[in-house]
Structure formats: C-alpha cells, structure tokens
C-alpha cells in the first residue's frame, strides 16, 4: 500500500469549502471539550487493572542494597540502556540501573499487547544496530523483535550485572555536604551516587479513566499496557491465536495509537468486538515488508551509517536542503503526510509574514486531512461507520497513526464501532458498558486509553518518584508555577549532577531514538569529563544565565503553537483541551534536533560552557 500523495497548498476542488471545514473542526472540538476531565490521581482501580509491576510478574525479594556508585540510572528502557552503553564507551563501569519492571525495555516491556509494533523505520529506531551488527527483519519492527534486540544489547555489553529489576525508586535527594545523590527504593535500598540519570521514559504509567461503575463490572478488565494473556490466550509474539476469545464479546475503550494496533488482532479472534470511540485517529497506510540483504547492504556498509540515517530522516522532515539518492529517501517513505512541516519550514526560509504563514499552512493542513478522510471512505464499506471514523481536526492535533488493517476491521460483521459523539462512555454496569444511553454487554473490557505523558504532567504522577534538590524542594514544586527550567532539557539548576532524558525543552523528532542518542552522548561525555583523573570539580549545574537563555529559546514561537493547540480536540498534546494552562516552556526545543545537538556539542567543546562546576 502506498503513502498519501504530496500536498498541494490548496484543498482539492472536491472537498467542502474551507470555512465549512473549519466550522466543523470547532464543533467537534467543543463537544469534546465539555466532557474532558483528565485523571490526575492513581486509585485502587488503577492499581488493580494497571498494576505498577504488570501482570504475571514473579515475586521478588532480596536483601537491601547499600552501596555508593559513580552513576545511578533510573529506568531500563532504551534511554537507560543507550546511556549505559555510552558510559562504558567512556570507560565508566561503576553504575547501577534501577528498573521497576521484571525486564528492561521500557515502553516495549510494558506494551506487549497483540499487534504492538513500531511505526518508525527499524533501521533508525532500534538503537545500536551498527555496534551489535544486527539487521532488523522487518522495515517496521514488532514489539517482539524490539524486545529481542534489548536482550541483545544487554548481553553484548554485559549490562545484566548492573541491572536491579522489579525495583521501584521512591525518592532521591541531593546531599550538598557529600556531593552525592541518595536514592531510596521499595526494597529499602540505600544507594548513593555522584550522578543521577533520570531515564524514566514516556509511555509506561497507564492513564486509566475514572468511569463510574468500574468496580461493579463482573467481567475481566485491564489496561492495554498490562495485557493479560491468561485471560485472552495467545502470546506477545502473535504466533498463536487468542483462542480464549473465541466465545467472548470484547470491548475496547480508546482509539489512539494503541487501540488502532490492538483492534485488528481482536477482530480476528473475538466472537464479537465493540470499539468505543471518543475521537477518531487520523489513519494512513504503513507499507511494511521483510528487509532483504539487497535492501540493507547498501545502507549499512559505511561506518556511522545509523546516525547518518537518523540525521537524513530528520533533514527530510525539517525540509532542509540536502542531496539524497533514492535509497536514502526510503528512510521517510510513508511520511509524505508530514510534508506539512516542509511547508512551514519553507515559509520560514522565504520570510513569509506570520499572518500569511498561518493561512498557507491551514490550507495545506485541510488538503491533507481531506486525503485522510477520503481514505476512510475508500476503505470502510458502511457509509455511516465511515463517517464516524473520519477525523475532523488539524493533522498534528493527535499523534498520526500508520496502520493498514484497522479501518478494514470494521468491514467484519463481528466488529461494531460505538461512536460516543465526543462524550466518551457513560458508565459500566455488571454486564458491560453504557454509551449513548445503551448498554453493550461484554465479557472482557480493555482500556486502550494511553499513558501519562510528560508534557504538563507532574513528574511524581508519571514515575511515583520524589526528586529533592539542593534546597529541599522537589522537582515538581520547582516546576509547579511557570513550568520547567533547564539547560538543553538535561541539566536543572538546584539539582546538581542530575541528568534528565525526555522531550521537554529538548530536540525532538518523530524518531525519539535520535533524541536518546544525542542526550546519551552528551551525558556520557559530561560525566566522563567530571570523572577524569585530576578533575578539579565533582559537581555541575547550569548557570542562571545559561538556563534562562535556554528557556527563552524554548518559549520562542509559543504564541503560534498555543493558537494551533487551541484548535485541537482534547488530548495529551494540548493538556486535555486546556493548552493555555500549560506554560510554553513545557514545549520541545523549537529550532529542531540538529540545532539542539549542535548546542550541546558547543557546550562540551568550550569547556562545558554554561555549566557551573565545583
């Protein structure tokens, strides 16, 4: 299946007038805005249906660890593992990785639902391919292939001896008198370290909505990020059917990225499937195929090929002038829809006036969304169902989803879309789900309702970790009023020797592995410089001036971003419909990932410019 064709700057003649479309966008946003109440607290139901350690985890007891290390890394996902490898490359082996799950892998450990897969090209998403010599089997790797690669990384660099699994960090505190971080866990561990790396990830803490009657439902229920194969049958690899669903009626609440991947597999195996939708996703095709040596060998021959390919992907999305051969261009195939960004960057280079820029961008956006809505009509047989599956909002309001089989699943007689007209489900009963005033009886209910995302969400809510800085203030308290203040999104004043990996104030592209690479490079070099023999300092933090300047850069263009977010239906990108409540400094670094990486390299080249040392 091909990707959506490149965009014209004006809508197709066949689509509705622009004014009609924009009015439709506003109507759809308003009806959802009135019924959007984000859940900010964990409840007993949260712990029951989305347990911290997941389902079927082994019991794990051990003696408390009391030790001092150079580095403690919190999180054994891709960010934590890549950072660990980079530390070893710097000759630093005195580190501990604390992981709350039974295994490492982060997002891919928790999200083992059927159909879980990456929609970024595997050659740039799977980290450390060049170093391990592994070539992915598919253009877009399955969750099973990614988890196998995580195990490969751990084995190659002997990281197993550094990892403490099933260990939830509860608090960390900076001791200025000792220049050490104190780390406490749920195993009564007492660790100290000179450097603390927060690699706590993005999609691991389930967002479980408070639906009245959840405790009364008599069937099974769980969050998609804590899939229970004992209930469904099957396995994470998808090698066998979910045979226990053959006689069951299943309900799925949520049609975001996870729900879209789950539905096709459930449609195959369940006796009956109800899909409860508040807001439809924008669905485009994903052209997956087996990677052959003929395809990969020209790519992987040159040293440094993976980093170079990540940069090529970034350059294509940021519309930079770059000569690329046909085979290089395959890195962004399927991302033609993201040429919106090229439109925007092209206007910036041409010094288009801001007022005119918004107009041209809106036209391009409408054209793209008309293409996506037409794709729905061409795929879904039933006209009424197709109309309900059409997204009516600007393209980047919600995460774009690339999936071939989701829309066609609704052509099955056993699959029924329950569109809630933007209101969400009303409540649960003993037998099922009430939506639109009607009870839908189900045997199993699956919450594909996403995760607590970083932007605008308190750190403790996402991690269950209190982080205390040099003045006894928590990270959440420090950021409560105006939002985050950082240098590069990594260093935080009054939290010495703390190094943070996340999207906030950092360079971000659709391939978050690229962000991880650049952050891990910087972190490992900074720690390496501090630990060099003869180093005259043991602690670092950003200067007031450097941090303030970085925050100011992050806030640039915030007015245009706010205006766009206000046009969107509620979601985690816009604070669940209240973007004005989220300070601009929660945003990404607006100049892009390459400028971000260059700024960090300049810092290191100029003797850690912008960092105080003592």
Curated annotation (Swiss-Prot):
Recorded catalytic activity of this chain's protein: gamma-lactone-2-keto[5.5.5.5]fenestrane + NADPH + O2 + H(+) = penifulvin A + NADP(+) + H2O
Record Gene3D superfamilies: FAD/NAD(P)-binding domain
Disruption phenotype: Abolishes the production of penifulvin A and leads to the accumulation of gamma-lactone-2-keto[5.5.5.5]fenestran.
Cofactor binding note of this UniProt entry: Binds 1 FAD per subunit.
Residue numbers marked as site, Transition state stabilizer: 399
Binding site for NADP(+): 255-261, 278-279, 398-399
Keyword flag NADP: yes
The protein's required cofactors: FAD
Alphabetical list of InterPro entries matching this protein: FAD-binding_Monooxygenases, FAD/NAD-bd_sf
GO function terms (MF aspect): monooxygenase activity
Pathway as given in its UniProt record: Secondary metabolite biosynthesis; terpenoid biosynthesis
Family: Belongs to the FAD-binding monooxygenase family.
Family annotation (PANTHER family): BLR3857 PROTEIN, L-ORNITHINE N(5)-MONOOXYGENASE-RELATED
Function: Baeyer-Villiger monooxygenase; part of the gene cluster that mediates the biosynthesis of penifulvin A, a potent insecticidal sesquiterpene that features a [5.5.5.6]dioxafenestrane ring. Within the pathway, peniC is responsible for the final regioselective Baeyer-Villiger oxidation of gamma-lactone-2-keto[5.5.5.5]fenestran between C1 and C2 to form the delta-lactone moiety of penifulvin A. The first step of the pathway is performed by the sesquiterpene cyclase peniA that generates the angular triquinane scaffold silphinene via cyclization of the linear farnesyl pyrophosphate (FPP).
Protein name: Baeyer-Villiger monooxygenase peniC
């Amino acid at each position: 299946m091909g990707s959506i064709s490149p965009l014209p700057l004006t809508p197709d003649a066949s689509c509705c007038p622009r004014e009609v479309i924009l009015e439709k966008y506003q109507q759809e946003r308003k009806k959802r805005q009135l019924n959007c109440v984000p859940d900010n607290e964990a409840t007993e139901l949260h712990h029951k249906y989305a347990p911290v350690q997941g389902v079927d985890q082994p019991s794990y007891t051990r003696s408390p660890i009391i030790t001092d290390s150079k580095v403690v890394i919190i999180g054994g996902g891709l960010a934590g593992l890549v950072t660990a490898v980079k530390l070893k490359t710097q000759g630093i082996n005195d580190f501990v990785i604390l992981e709350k799950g039974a295994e490492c892998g982060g997002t891919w450990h928790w999200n083992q639902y059927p159909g879980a897969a990456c929609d970024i090209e595997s050659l740039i998403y799977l980290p450390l391919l060049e170093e391990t010599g592994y070539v992915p089997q598919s253009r877009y790797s399955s969750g099973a292939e990614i988890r196998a690669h995580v195990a490969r990384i751990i084995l190659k660099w002997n990281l197993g001896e550094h990892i403490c699994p099933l260990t939830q960090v509860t608090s960390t505190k900076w001791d200025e008198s000792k220049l050490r971080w104190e780390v406490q866990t749920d195993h009564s561990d007492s660790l100290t370290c000179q450097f603390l790396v927060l690699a706590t990830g993005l999609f691991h803490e389930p967002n479980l909505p408070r639906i009245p009657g959840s405790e009364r439902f008599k069937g099974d229920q769980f969050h998609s990020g804590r899939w229970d194969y004992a209930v469904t049958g099957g396995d994470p690899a998808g090698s066998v059917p979910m045979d226990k669903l053959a006689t069951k009626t299943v309900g799925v609440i949520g049609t975001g990225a996870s729900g879209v991947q789950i539905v096709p597999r459930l449609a195959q195996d369940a006796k009956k499937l109800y899909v409860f939708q508040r807001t439809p996703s924008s669905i485009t095709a994903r052209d997956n195929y087996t990677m052959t040596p003929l395809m990969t060998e020209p790519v992987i021959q040159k040293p440094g090929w993976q980093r170079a390919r990540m940069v090529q992907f970034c350059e294509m999305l940021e519309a930079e002038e770059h000569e690329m051969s046909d085979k290089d261009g395959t890195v962004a195939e399927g991302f033609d829809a993201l040429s919106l960004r090229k439109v925007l960057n092209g206007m910036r280079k041409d010094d288009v006036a801001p007022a005119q820029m918004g107009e041209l961008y809106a036209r391009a956006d409408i054209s793209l969304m008309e293409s996506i809505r037409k794709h729905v009509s061409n795929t879904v047989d039933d006209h009424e169902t197709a109309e309900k599956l059409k997204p009516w909002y600007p393209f980047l309001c919600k995460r774009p989803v690339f999936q071939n089989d989701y829309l066609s699943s609704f052509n099955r007689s056993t699959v029924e879309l329950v569109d809630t007209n933007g209101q969400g489900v009303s409540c649960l009963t003993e037998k099922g789900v009430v939506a639109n005033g009607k009870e839908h009886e189900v045997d199993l209910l699956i919450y594909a309702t996403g995760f607590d995302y970083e932007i605008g969400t308190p750190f403790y809510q996402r991690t269950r970790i209190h982080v205390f800085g040099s003045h006894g203030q928590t990270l959440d308290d420090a950021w409560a009023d105006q939002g985050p203040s950082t240098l590069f999104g990594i260093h935080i004043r009054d939290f010495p020797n703390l190094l943070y990996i996340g999207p906030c104030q950092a360079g971000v592209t659709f391939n978050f592995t690229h962000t991880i690479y650049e952050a891990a490079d910087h972190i490992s070099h900074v720690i390496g410089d501090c630990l060099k023999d003869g180093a005259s300092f043991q602690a670092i933090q950003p200067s007031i001036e450097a941090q303030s300047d970085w925050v100011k850069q992050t806030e640039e263009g915030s007015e245009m971003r706010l205006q766009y977010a206000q046009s969107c239906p509620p979601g985690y990108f816009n604070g669940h419909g209240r973007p004005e409540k989220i300070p601009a400094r929660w945003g990404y670094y607006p100049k892009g990932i390459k400028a971000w990486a260059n700024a960090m390299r300049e810092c290191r080249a100029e003797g850690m410019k912008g960092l105080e040392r003592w």
